Amino acid sequence: MKEKVIIYQVLPRLFGNQNTTCKENGTIEENGCGKLNNFSDEVLASIHDMGFTHIWYTGVIRHATQTNYSSYGIPTQHAEVVKGKAGSPYAITDYYDIDPDLAVNVSMRMKEWEQLIERTHKAGMKVIMDFVPNHVARE
């Protein structure tokens, strides 16, 4: 008999964020941001132990933001077309990149994503990467 699929959906930019400021229109420095590395082996094991077979990571694709990552070769977006400082995780700017906010080391963001996939598989779960093809940034 096939195993029943039970999906745990999570928004990594909220998961593990210890900053409780929650300032409206705040910067990443003011409000903080969860990181891919917050999903440790222990955290993933506890999610698996609750009976989940898959983790649906939502909002990991690079999207419009007012945070300046130009030193990493990421173009800046005009503030008037970005939803808040953090931007919407559905305002995609590059379907082939990971949101730099989610990385401890921005230049290693893809490696951090690959390591999270490996940790998730090691914990006995499969990965679903949120992908909404008709949602893009305004520029």
Model-identified regions with their sequence ranges:
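N-terminal structural segment of carbohydrate-active enzymes
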Residues: 1-126, 134-138
